[in-house]
Amino acid sequence: MSSQVISASRLYQIVASPTSDNDAKSRSINELKTHVKKDFVDIKQVPKYVEALSIAVDISDTGISTSSFSVLSHLVKRVSMQDSSGEVLKSQSYLVLPIIINRLGDIKASARISAKKALEAYWFSAPKEVEDSIIDIAFSHKNSKVINESIIWLDHIITNVNPHFKINLFLPHIVKLLRLNSDSDEVLIENIKTLFKDYYSLKHNRLYKFDLSKEFDTQKIPSNVHESIISQIGTSSSILMKQATPDIGLDHNFISAGTTRVTVNSMGRDKGTISSNSSTPASLSSSTMSRPKSRTNFHNYTKSISPSQEDEQITKPSVHNSAFNKYNTNQMSAPAKPVAMVNENSNEINSEISPEIEKIIAKTFTYKIDSSILPLDVKDVDDLCGTINELLPIFEGKETEFNWGMREKNIIKLRSIIRGNSSRLFTNELTSYLKESSESICKAVTSLRTTLSSHGCHFLKECAIILKEHFDPLVDSYVPHLMKLCSATKHIASSNANMALCAIFINVPYNYRLLHKILVSANEKNVQPRSYSGIWLQVVLVRFHDTSSFSYRGSNSISGLDTSIKILTKLLADPNPNVRQVAKDTYWCFWDKFPSEAESLLTRLDTNVVKAIERSKPRTITSRNQPSTLSSLTARKARPSIKESIIARNKELRKQKDQTSISRPSSRINSTSSPCPPDNDYLQKHDKPQFSTLDSGKFSRLGVAKRTPSTSSLSRVESNQDAITRKVSDSVSSNAKKHNDSQGINADAQIQNIETMKSTYSVDDNSSNRTNMEQTNKFESFDKQSDPILKFLSSNQKEFITEGINLLKYAIMGEEDLSSEVNGLLKKISVRNQDLLKPLFLSTDNLFKKTYQFFSFEDFFRVCCILIHTIDTRLVDLIVSIAGVDDIYESAIKLISYTTNLGNIIDDSDLTMQIIRFKSIIVRSIIEFLNQGLDKIPISDSYFSKLVTNLFELVSLVKSTGLYKSFCELLIKLYSINPTLFTSELQMIATSTREEVEYVVGIDDVLDLNRGHAINFTTQYELTRVVPGNNLRKMSPLKAPSDLTMVVPVEKELFEDDNIDIDSKIQSESANDTGFRTPPKLAGNHTSPIHSERSTIIETDGNISDNVEEYVNDAMDVDQNPSEEIVNGLKNDIEMHNDDNKVKEKTSNDMSDSLPLIDESDNIFVEIDSDSASRKPDLFTKFAQHDNSSELVENFAQVKITELSKQRLRNNDPIKKFIDKVDPLNKISLKNKPISIYEDVNFKGSPQKVKDYSYTELNWFNFQLAKLAMDKEDNQEIDYCIEDFKSLCDNLSSKKIEGKEFVSVLNYLQNIQISNAEFSRYFQSSGHSLIENSLWNFFDNHINLPVSKKLSGLILLKQLLINRLRVSLDRLWNLLVGLSSESSSSVDELSLAISEAFDEMLAGLFSSEIIFARILTTLENAVLERESFSLPFILECLSKVLSTNAVSLLIDEKLIMRIDNVLSGFMNDEEVEIRRCVISSYGKLLKASRISSSIETNEDIRSEYSVMDDILKKLSIPQKKLIEYYSQS
């Protein structure tokens, strides 16, 4: 008995819900574990399981966290067995792999073992993702255990799993670890030695030993370590050095991008490699990464990596030495202004910078510009503009597998342009073009493709070095994207961004916004930008410390010096040791430039920080010139204990208690200690009046004090810091206890008690601060370390954060000065604990507006969507009043893109989890906001396109939810704003989604070549609806043919309000000419697009009586000469019907006058000429259908199943069939006859149905027609002259036909059905064969025809096939095969045209069996004469034929064996496309054989499936899996 299946959504709700207890979570997780271990899991629910478990592993409860990881490990193993494609695990690698790799460093051995087993199972399904994660996460992990275990895991894979596994990808990183830890981590060194020994001792890896030796020399591994490892392998390093001597000139053709370079051939190929300064050995470049054997064909790819001189880009975050190297000299060098000198006779660009700055960045990257790229000169400004504009179109839209290579080539070309003469001769124009194209370049910089991103970063670095101060206008366009990239998890990308930013800071002139950006980076939650911010600050200090602008206080009264102190204060107290090390180096740089300010800064720092700074003192700073306060601060008495501080503070409070006045505290900013509980009498006496005043909005009367500088001494601050947290914690816990003991206490009273406590203690603190002010006045600025708001908001406990939010609320209302650090803390809270922000967002409108200044609008809008559940007009007006239009639409678009694709969230796991939890709430809020906001906020075309594109992705998500009605209203509103842009974006989405949206908004585009434009109808039902009336029951069977396209019941509610008879309503829509009534817009209660449309076509008496003969011929579709009795009977019926019409028209004249009718000239389905007027009665018959449901019931009641003999089937009288078909009363007479159902015992399958062609499908042929329709003259008329047609055919046959003549021939072919009668008869008799023969003559010796004429001929040929006119199959097939051999690529225009022509062959005009036999014959000849055939095209055709339903009726054992004999010879072909087509054909053949086997009842006939089994047994496992995959498509 299988275990209970756990619902993924239910598990997610339990785990993510804050109200669920730990027991329920643990129980649910254990149930899932039992299910996963025993039974198969539902693959579709795996992503939701992973999301739930990723939340559960972070729960503080140890038992839940351990169980969750155990379940996750079992789930990975289970999915790897079930999902042979590996797509599920690949898509979830961003969530699962970081969890597994982090567990490699777990304290428990069992957890580490489980992690390694799970990683191995994951590797079998997603090898590339696992290997990339090991490099990006494991090798740069701060836990040394993780690094060690990852090395051990690699050794396990080589020795126990796959001895052919290649470590070329990991080699540079492993050697880097060896170099960094050669003296510190002996265990890691031994593990690496073991790995190298096990790997290079294998027989097939011995030839690659010299690669290891070369890597050691490149990264300068100590000789003792080098020799010890090489000796273990068994070869001396001297021999390896001889083997590793580079062959100069082996690989000259490369473009360098740091550690990454791209091999190119005149910018024509993109072959990605990663190499060192020396040439790549042939053995290494030809080696491939070995994958798990079961997935070799899926994942093999060539990859080799070796570090260059910029090897720091692939290592862990650099750890700076404690001694600052740049102070080794006794005298500092004056900063020199960087100058980039371009040598016009060489492609090298010399860049000179200050030696001091060079030492700062030396350990991070190489400042020198790469010389491997040749400069590209331009003639003039127009040449520069044209060259850049040619490079930009490829960057439009999203990055895909097919365009990233071209983007990389274009960035390389931009690197050549910046090296050329444009930077000297056209500097301003070049700068302007770079600013306009910033969006495209930033797409390359932030790309997930490492080589593309590297080239983008190097391009910006080179721009800054070459353009220097001219790069300043581009700073705001590029720096934000680079700083965001610094937070990337991929260390190469992060290092490249840091390199580009350093180059910018080195070269651009000073501006305060640069320092502000550094300050923002110093407050980032990611450690990498915080570490880099110290380096950037050093560069700025060295360059601008002696400039007046650096010390100038601008409009915000903040100088560069003040901002530098803020950055240093933040970095020196950073929890990360790497950041603190950089900060200490930065401090000594700051001390060298501003000694007095540096000494003052020391007095504000913690004692431990000061001691750490003392230990990192450079050697050049002796006791004589070190900071004077440094010794005194480090030697001072230790601060008092917590107990002493509490006793002293209580004494002070008792003295001040009697002197405290009843008023609101002047400021909570000067408070340096946390409150402790006052007595209850005081609370009861003073808390309520204070809160009533605040809540009433009269905050200004309380005399709120502005922030005043902190005056407490350094020792006083330090002695009270610990007491702050302790007392506030006691206060909160005390309040919680009171609440539990007395449940009847009002919640508002408790809040007031807490507020009053804060007021009392703030008053006491103010008194204490005034005393301290009299004693000392050292600090002239506010001390952030003592700010209670910052302390509360930076806490991890919700109680403290809540207190901080309340304090911040009243500080905002009082318009107090607040630290800029509040912004970063609020951003963190908005992602992790957004519910705590309710006091700021759900109070008054004034507070709501003021709160906005502390958030970016994206964060502000996201919190609004989550917290505010009702989006009304007031909220929309508030948001519009405080934010810009661009910010609103940009934020809405981003949030929608996050909900549809979590991959759009870059390196923010907290935000990812928030979007997962509140996805539905965010989508609902955005839809409601846009529904109301679009009427008030103008929207530009660019934002309109982005918005509708993202909304289209929501269609499938909201369709079955309650949001769908509002979502449809939003789409209709957007369509009404800009129909053209809406329709163009709609064409880019999937067909199913497009049809859904078209149905919602009422779009139905029909392309008419003769008119040259598209006419829109409300829906596709407009032209096919039939509204039956009571009067139709009296009509003869001739007037109610059975071939109507659609019958829809009358919607009575359309006429209930007017009390109008339905038949009268129908007749009111009649007119003298055939026409369509304009569909009304959606209004009132008519929500369905179908309900809103009605179209009626009624003919006048004159038309009907004049054209009775034509009418009968069209309605019956039989002999053109009917009997006189039939015609007379039809005339009588029509006259009776017209009499009824006349009577009803008298009662509905007023209504018919008000109905708008479209003239025939506007009807794309009616051709305007004299010869076509006689065809109008045919349209009338489509509205003569009566309700025959009772007749159908009667017929089916008389069904009698009989089996006729074969002889009777053969002896069916064709004359009798013809008489029955012509007889107008045959339908009525059939009611009395039994209905026979025949069993086709000797006929396999049903007759093949000819498919109708769709001119609205997006393909090459329709695109050509659309182009011709746009170029066609409006007044061009077609004269269907037989002589002109013959003349055109003669020109076609002699290959002299040109553009206008070609269009004329195409028009003849397209309008055969509506041409005059004389031409129609001629074309049916001899014109068809004439145009066919002309085409064959045209294509004779087609190898000499230009491509444009070949395409024109194929258009005519396909039009013949679309008209369902038979042509010679043999000549047609030979022509397509011959043309396919002349195409240069499988994706060029000629190949598309040929492929579409073959698709039309399969539309039913020719028998599938005949086409099948022709293809097999051609393939059998191709086995012997390969060079004379285009194999990919023929094999693709075979695959298409095998995909048709008719093939399953033809399959038998002999045919399967024949196909196998043909295809087996191409299974191992050198061309990938041929192998793909062969595998695809085998897959379709397997599918067809299974279908054939399932429908056969004769056991002798069902043997072909066993034949397929025999064929599959001959193939390899990967080939079998591929065939199985294609058989399911």
From Swiss-Prot:
Source species, domain of life: Eukaryota
Molecular function, one GO term: microtubule binding
GO cellular component, one term: cytoplasmic microtubule
InterPro entries per the UniProt record, alphabetical: ARM-like, ARM-type_fold, CLASP_N_dom, TOG
Family matches, as SMART domains: TOG
Primary role: Microtubule binding protein that promotes the stabilization of dynamic microtubules. Required for mitotic spindle formation.
GO terms, biological process: astral microtubule depolymerization; cell division; mitotic spindle assembly
Classification lineage: Eukaryota, Fungi, Dikarya, Ascomycota, Saccharomycotina
Compositional bias segments (type: Polar residues): 295-308, 619-634, 708-723
Keyword Kinase appears in the UniProt entry: no
Family (UniProt): Belongs to the CLASP family.
Compartments, as annotated in UniProt: Cytoplasm, Cytoskeleton; Nucleus; Cytoplasm, Cytoskeleton, Spindle
Start-end of Low complexity biased regions: 273-290, 660-674
Protein name stated in the entry: Protein STU1
Region named Disordered: 266-314, 617-638, 651-745, 1070-1090
The encoding gene: STU1
SUPFAM superfamilies (UniProt xref): ARM repeat
Keywords, sorted A to Z: Cell cycle, Cell division, Cytoplasm, Cytoskeleton, Microtubule, Mitosis, Nucleus
Major subcellular location class: cytoplasm
Subunit and partners: Interacts with microtubules.
